[in-house]
A protein has these predicted regions:
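Ubiquitin-like/PB1-type beta-grasp interaction modules and other compact soluble beta-rich domains
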Residues: 1-74
Length: 75
């Protein structure tokens, strides 16, 4: 199955601006996607799947758009 991944903030600088297409086994979870991408779960502040708030255990579907927003700090 294929999903698209969109990055923001520091992840966008690291991974690129355009949404990336990733192939996964059917029934894969968001956590498995992050593992495939080499991203630690604790890096993610906001996680959205196809426009809705999501969890790391959520199963993905064909053509889902996964938006990854890292924790943002400042002072």
């Amino acid at each position: 199955m294929k999903v698209r991944v969109r990055y923001f903030a520091s992840l966008r600088q690291e991974k690129g601006q355009a949404p990336m297409e990733v192939g996964l086994d059917p029934g894969a979870t968001v956590g498995e996607l992050l593992s495939e991408l080499g991203i630690e779960q604790d890096q993610i502040g906001i996680l959205i799947v196809s426009g809705k708030s999501a969890t790391f255990g959520q199963k993905l579907n064909e053509n889902d758009l996964v938006t990854l927003i890292p924790h943002i700090g400042g002072g």
